Amino acid sequence: MCGRTSCHLPRDVLTRACAYQDRRGQQRLPEWRDPDKYCPSYNKSPQSNSPVLLSRLHFEKDADSSERIIAPMRWGLVPSWFKESDPSKLQFNTTNCRSDTVMEKRSFKVPLGKGRRCVVLADGFYEWQRCQGTNQRQPYFIYFPQIKTEKSGSIGAADSPENWEKVWDNWRLLTMAGIFDCWEPPEGGDVLYSYTIITVDSCKGLSDIHHRMPAILDGEEAVSKWLDFGEVSTQEALKLIHPTENITFHAVSSVVNNSRNNTPECLAPVDLVVKKELRASGSSQRMLQWLATKSPKKEDSKTPQKEESDVPQWSSQFLQKSPLPTKRGTAGLLEQWLKREKEEEPVAKRPYSQ
């Protein structure tokens, strides 16, 4: 299953991370719908708003179905046929949707039949492993392996469409297959857009943590086909729904257990052997500053906005091809950052908020 995610990037940086090619091969950035509803967070839970990609054709009848929109949507699908005036009164859980029953349950079959497919964006997701012989559960952060590309430059250098994709050399966002629906309050009011994340059996690498995982769309082709309901039928799109082994993970602190905790500490690897958090060195602090390019809260007029050109970049010496995890607790790229120069620089205090 998938019940907690992280999506901390500020809006402009998230947009650049979603650069794509349209059907004509032109580099594009997706446009936003209801951008003010997006609230970055290291610790997103159901009923919060998360950014999703969807086809522009859902909003404009004559649009090219390969063109994309980013829209914040409520996590937890509210069916269009729901009759109550309060969506929180929905009596069943729609946070996730099992792939093996998606065409059996009305809540998911109807919007899927209308082409309401979306891609849920996240840095990664959290999952909890039940510790044998105890009631305790160990949380893990799960994400795409971060691979060094041939791209160069900085985010601030993206001064033309041709450069948008070339300069994005940062964290690869996790792209999860979702279904959305549109609910209109019986008494009138704004339409509520909400989504569910499709889940599949866990891949071998995650099976020790949990028996289910999100349906991850690995690569631009898979994302394009899932979104393009104008050209790709439901039957063809469902062939994209399957487990993937192209993931990595590391153990994190129990700080993430409380969804009100919203700091980079939620993502920081912990050492399960000594049961303590890896202390943050100067290098890891710079990494955490990148994770916190902007405080994960709604825009505050009192706080000057950081210029795009000031957003730190991943150093090429750390952006190496990450091997698939061979054992539980592999921390991958984040752990390399947190461990580097541990003994060479003064220990910095870790950010924490309750």
Swiss-Prot record:
Site (Required for sensing abasic sites): 127
KW Isomerase (keyword) present: no
Key words of the record: Autocatalytic cleavage, Chromosome, Covalent protein-DNA linkage, DNA damage, DNA-binding, Hydrolase, Isopeptide bond, Lyase, Phosphoprotein, Protease, Ubl conjugation
Entry GO terms, CC: replication fork
Location of Phosphoserine modifications: 160, 295, 322
GO BP of this protein: DNA damage response; double-strand break repair via alternative nonhomologous end joining; interstrand cross-link repair; positive regulation of isotype switching; protein-DNA covalent cross-linking repair; proteolysis; somatic hypermutation of immunoglobulin genes
Subunit details: Interacts (via PIP-box motif) with PCNA.
UniProt name for this protein: Abasic site processing protein HMCES
Organism: Homo sapiens (Human)
Gene behind this protein: HMCES
